[in-house]
A protein has these predicted regions:
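Gram-negative outer-membrane beta-barrel transporters
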Residues: 722-724, 744-837
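Short, acidic, small-residue-rich periplasmic hinge/interaction motif at the N-terminus
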Residues: 46, 89, 98, 105-150, ...
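Outer membrane beta-barrel strand-and-loop segments of large Gram-negative receptors
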Residues: 558, 562-566, 605-607, 611-615, ...
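Transmembrane beta-barrel wall of Gram-negative outer-membrane proteins
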Residues: 376-400, 415-475, 500-518, 573-577
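Surface-exposed extracellular loop regions of Gram-negative outer-membrane beta-barrel proteins
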Residues: 529, 637, 657-702, 722-748, ...
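C-terminal beta-signal and adjacent terminal beta-strands/loops
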Residues: 401-403, 407, 413, 724-727, ...
Length: 933
């Protein structure tokens, strides 16, 4: 027993820390001044002060580590800094006659700290510690008593450096389960605040956590909380990571919500661009093995089932360069929220998930400019205040045909143009050879962002946002083939030109009508376009020496226009609840046509639809329990039907660390992107409107259960989900005849087939995240399955094309001074595919023979497992001790050059099916230079 008591005593003493003294009691120097930026846990700040200014501190390290310091000091005295830190965190300090400071969580802690045995402290301070305690214990809590209790508090969270609002910042009242999240303009409302002397803990991804202590006077005014970016923490005291400074944050109170910090993406490995949507692919539940798509495959869904909003308007084309990069410039983005499922009644029109992107408003304090250079593109941006009430932001990114761009472009085009037939599985065609290519490639992409924000007063905000992105892929080339009938050369000029993109804009008015009523009203426009021209102009010498000129080809066009208006309102009805409600209207015009030889329109679709509706949602707190029931109503005029979507989510805080949560809801989708069965014969996909017959309105039901356990340093999260999908659509374009570009004297007939089916997806996601310290990162694992059932393929369910059973992701970041090292490793089990298992030949009278594939069951085969290791090194460029002006980054994609299969090509040789794997990118390095002024 004695041994146990001594051991327990030792453990207790080990957690009680004091700053080290050098010699004698008269070395205290709390009048020294500090002129630098500090961000760190309080215990480490005290250690720094003790070593630098020779001050003795006595405190409980476990207690003090919970409090953070984030401030810029300009020749402030140490004693004033200590007083301010204690005031901000609602803790106590006591100074003894010899200058020793006790830092206390509660006044009574002084007794415990003073009664430590002599061996617990250094001999030089023992005598002083045992002296009578006569000094005053100072704290603002002792001086200020609360005037109001159980009241509602409104405020706004902004960036300290730029004045921009911070959406989706988390606010929590310390010591309670009372929380709030800022809206898109940074405003928040806290209900049932215990007292007007409470302490607010404010956190936001990429920013330093702030502790804001209320006073009766401050609580009665409009509260503005200014936060400091984590990148400012470049001083002698550098601690990477109170909550809110990570690249990714998971909102533990809300169901299936992930928040991204665009400014911190530079530290992650990339293929050539900081990429918002690809960063999300590093989280569990979002597939990370689709290199050819920056779109989100969320929980067994497809990218078109993910609603992507940028400043309120829908973006239909979310990628560049055949899907390798997302279409969003991180320099124009302030905040990104992804809802992986069970999302609010505020959002609709998609079956799987929502990605809500908020653009930057522009610096409201000083002008700033920057440039990013990589092996792929040039990116310039600028922001400036126009006056004290308005600001402007612009950004422009354009690719250039450097080695990285050409590597990706050649990887794609070399595998998508050398085909002689047009048939897919079940149709005629095979792969043929060509000779003497002469290619003049002219390909590029660009995107442009602009935003103007006007704030006439503290009640109104007006903003105009604009986006334009476009890709041009020109793989046209000349082809020469020696004539077998003469000494001349048969020549052909092949056109293969694809352009696609998206233009969008929005005009928004935000108004705080009262402290309890807030509204956002928005009008938006979005235009997706895709054009592809494929043709051949040939000069052929016949047996008589006569030159015959022929022209053939096809053109494919898809255009979607979306004009929308919506108004979202938020009303605080009590200290414990609020109502979200609003209305929306959208007019969509979708065209798709397929033309042969400039004259014959094989497909000509032109549909318009009007969508009207509204929603209402209640957020009600019952202490630790939060319930959020909601309802969304939509009238869709193409079917002339009404669609009701009930939604519900709940969370229960067992304590301040452990949270349980659940969600369910019904979701409808009216605009669909269908994918070709044979991607080599035209566009990979195109958008169409549901018509209620051949293309039904898709629907889904989500069921989600989860739990999270969060400490100061770690987050442990688990979520399980089940989705039931109905009225899914697949598209097949079958070709009969042998006409087309390579057989100009014959005609082809195209048969459209829309197949309808159903499906389900289920899975469980695990996340372990380290948020604090020089080393941060996370490990994610997903066990999932996705199955579909279409009658055309039989009566059984088959694996969906996006079915990936196992995904493991390890993300690691380490910061050492100005250096940041990162490494990511992704493993995914193989995707399913349909494979030819044989072939047969049909003799056609007068037209030769045609060979057809015999295919296996739908998606019964699987590719080999996917895995790759990426790494990056980033060095921050510093102008002064607190000002970051840029960075240099080296990124290495697929370090061990893994051959991961993209898809498989087939040809027929002697009635034998020959397969060839087409792989994703191998080892790819990249260099990035970022500068800002």
């Amino acid at each position: 027993m004695k041994t146990i008591l001594l051991f327990l005593l030792f453990c207790g003493l080990f957690s009680i820390q004091q700053a080290r003294a050098q010699n004698g009691p008269n070395f205290q120097n709390d009048t020294a001044t500090v002129n630098k930026f500090i961000t760190a846990p309080l215990d480490e700040v005290l250690d720094e002060f003790a070593a630098t200014y020779k001050i003795r501190f006595i405190f409980d390290r476990a207690q003090m580590h919970k409090y953070g310091v984030s401030d810029h000091y300009f020749h402030d005295k140490v004693k004033d800094i200590i007083r301010g830190i204690c005031r901000a965190n609602d803790i106590y300090y006591a100074k003894q006659p010899d200058g020793t400071y006790f830092i206390l969580e509660k006044p009574e802690d002084i007794t415990r700290l003073r009664r430590l045995p002599p061996g617990a402290m250094k001999p030089t301070v023992e005598a002083k510690i045992n002296q009578a305690f006569t000094e005053e214990v100072i704290t603002t809590a002792a001086a200020a008593r609360p005037v109001r209790t159980n009241f509602a508090l409104a405020g706004r969270v902004t960036d300290n450096a730029t004045g921009e609002s911070l959406p989706s910042a988390s606010i929590k009242i310390r010591g309670t389960n009372i929380t709030a999240v800022t809206n898109t303009d940074g405003y928040f409302n806290l209900t049932n605040v215990p007292a007007d002397t409470s302490v607010l803990i404010v956190s936001y991804a990429g920013y330093q956590t702030s502790a804001e202590r209320l006073t009766p006077e401050r609580a009665s005014q409009k509260l503005v909380i200014s936060m400091l970016p984590a990148d400012n923490a470049l001083t002698e005291v550098v601690i990477n990571g109170e909550k809110g400074e990570a690249v990714m944050n998971t909102d533990t109170r809300r169901v299936s919500v992930v928040q991204l910090t665009p400014a911190k993406l530079a530290v992650l490995p990339n293929i050539g661009e900081r990429d918002i949507l690809r960063a999300f692919q590093l989280m569990p539940g979002i597939s990370g093995s689709n290199e050819s798509s920056s779109g989100a495959y969320v929980r067994g869904g497809t990218p078109d089932q993910n609603l992507v909003l940028f400043d309120g308007f829908t973006v239909y084309q979310v990628d560049h360069l055949y899907g390798f990069y997302s279409a969003f410039n991180v320099n124009a983005v302030k905040d990104v929220q992804m809802y992986k499922g069970g999302f609010s009644a505020k959002f609709g029109g998609r079956l799987s998930s929502v990605t809500d992107i908020t653009g930057k408003d522009g610096n409201k304090k000083t002008a700033g400019f920057g440039v990013d250079l990589s092996l792929l593109s040039v990116n310039i941006y600028g922001e400036t205040p126009l006056n004290d009430k308005s600001s402007l932001l612009f950004s422009l990114r354009r690719s250039y045909q450097g080695p990285l761009y050409n590597k990706i472009f050649n990887k794609l085009t070399n595998t998508t143009t050398a085909t002689t037939g047009g048939g897919g599985f079940g149709g005629p065609g095979g792969r043929g050879g060509m000779a003497n290519f002469q290619t003049q490639v002219s390909s590029w992409f660009y995107d442009l962002n602009g935003k103007y924000t006007y704030t006439p007063d503290d009640k109104n905000i007006f903003s105009l946002s604009f986006y334009s992105g476009k890709d041009k892929m020109d793989n046209s080339h000349d082809l020469g083939i020696p004539s077998v009938l003469s000494s001349s050369v048969n020549s052909s000029s092949i056109t293969d030109l694809t352009t696609y993109g998206n233009v969008g804009s929005s005009a928004k008015w935000s108004r705080r009508w009262t402290d309890k009523l807030y509204a956002n009203t928005l009008v938006s426009y979005s235009n997706f376009f895709s054009h592809r021209n494929r043709g051949m102009a040939s000069s052929i010498t016949d047996s008589t020496g006569t030159v015959v000129d022929t022209n053939s080809g096809s053109a494919e066009n898809n255009n979607l226009k979306d004009l929308s208006a919506k108004s979202d309102w938020e009303l605080n009805i009590s200290n414990t609840g609020k109502i979200l409600f609003g209305g929306f209207a959208s007019r969509q015009d979708v065209k798709y046509d397929y033309t042969q030889n400039d004259t014959t329109k094989l497909i000509d679709q032109n549909n318009q639809a009007l969508t009207l509706g509204g929603y209402a949602e209640l957020e009600q707190n019952f202490g630790a329990l939060r319930l959020t029931p909601g309802l969304r109503y939509t009238h869709y005029d193409l079917t002339n039907k009404n669609y009701i979507e009930p939604r519900f989510s709940a969370s229960y805080a067992i304590n301040d660390k452990l949270m349980l949560k659940a969600a369910t809801g019904r979701f409808y989708q009216f605009t669909n992107r269908v994918v070709r069965e044979d991607i080599l014969s035209g566009s990979k996909d195109f958008w169409v409107l549901a018509n209620g017959s051949s293309i039904p309105v898709g629907s889904a039901i989500h069921y989600i259960l989860g739990a999270s356990y969060e400490t100061n340093k770690f987050l442990f999260s688990i979520e399980g989900y089940y989705k039931r999908l109905s009225d899914l659509t697949e598209y097949s374009l079958r070709q009969t005849g042998t006409g087309g570009m390579f057989n100009p004297n014959s005609t082809i007939t195209l048969e459209q087939n829309f197949y309808n089916g159903k499906g389900y997806a289920k899975g469980i996601e695990f996340l372990v995240q380290k948020k604090v310290g020089q080393y941060t990162g996370w490990i994610g694992y997903t066990l999932a399955s996705a199955f579909n059932k279409f009658d055309v393929y039989g009566t059984d369910y088959f694996p969906a094309a996006q079915d990936v059973r196992n995904e493991f992701k390890s993300i690691n970041l380490y910061q050492e001074g100005r250096w940041t090292f990162s490494a990511t490793w992704i493993y995914a089990s193989g995707r399913p595919y349909t494979a030819p298992v044989g072939s047969y030949t049909i003799n056609r009278a007068g037209s030769g023979t045609e060979t057809y594939f015999v295919v296996s069951g739908k998606n019964t085969e699987r590719f080999k497992a996917y895995h790759r290791l990426d790494a990056a090194i980033t060095y921050d460029l510093i102008r002064t001790s607190t000002k970051k002006v840029g960075s240099i980054g080296f990124s290495f994609f697929n370090i061990y050059n893994r051959s991961n299969t993209w898809y498989r090509e087939y040809s027929i040789q002697g009635n034998q099916v020959i397969s060839t794997d087409v792989n994703y990118l191998g080892f790819t390095p990249n260099l990035t230079l970022s500068l800002k002024w």
